[in-house]
């Protein structure tokens, strides 16, 4: 019998991770709710639509809209109406976001290291493989 359910352990790690991230990103005006995930994807794919953000990050539309609005108000992104679909917005990073990108990546890398610092390289590879294996959605 397991000491603790796997879901509970994953939830605990997620909450701890989010708490640390929120604290590290707050000075830059980036809040919780996955804003860093949205910004990272927008930096990787300038001109992505809000719908694509929703689908790729697997957030609901309301969370996407709220995060995009907050990132826009903080000056990290800009939204423009999609010329091919007037009901859709294209989201791109601003100069502020491009300048912040290495800082964001550094924070995320540092956090990742802190999560696995007690593991050997083999254990880290194994846990990544196992988490990816159980996170695959059978409906996709």
Language-model segment annotations:
Residues 1-28:
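N-terminal leader segment of winged-helix/HTH proteins
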Residues 20, 36-40, 99, 126:
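Pre-recognition alpha-helix immediately N-terminal to the DNA-recognition helix
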Residues 14, 40-44, 132:
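Short, locally clustered residues in the helix-turn-helix/winged-helix DNA-binding domain
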Residues 7-8, 31-40:
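Short alpha-helical elements of helix-turn-helix
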Residues 125-140:
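Exposed, interaction-prone assembly regions rather than primary DNA-binding/catalytic cores
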Residues 35, 46-90:
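Canonical helix-turn-helix DNA-binding module
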Residues 21-31, 113-119:
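Short amphipathic alpha-helical boundary/capping segments
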Residues 69-129:
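Charged, amphipathic alpha-helical coiled-coil/dimerization segments
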């Amino acid at each position: 019998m397991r000491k603790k359910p796997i879901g509970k352990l994953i939830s605990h790690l997620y909450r701890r991770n989010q708490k640390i991230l929120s604290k590290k990103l707050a000075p830059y005006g980036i809040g919780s709710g996955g804003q860093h995930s949205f910004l990272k994807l927008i930096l990787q794919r300038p001109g992505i639509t809000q719908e694509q953000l929703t689908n790729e990050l697997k957030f609901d539309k309301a969370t996407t809209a709220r995060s995009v609005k907050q990132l826009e108000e903080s000056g990290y992104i800009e939204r423009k109406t999609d010329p091919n679909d007037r009901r859709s917005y294209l989201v791109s990073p601003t100069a502020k976001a491009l300048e912040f990108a290495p800082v964001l990546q550094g924070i995320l890398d540092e956090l990742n290291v802190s999560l696995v610092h007690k593991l050997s390289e083999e254990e880290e590879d194994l846990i990544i493989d196992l988490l990816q294996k159980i996170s695959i959605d059978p409906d996709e």
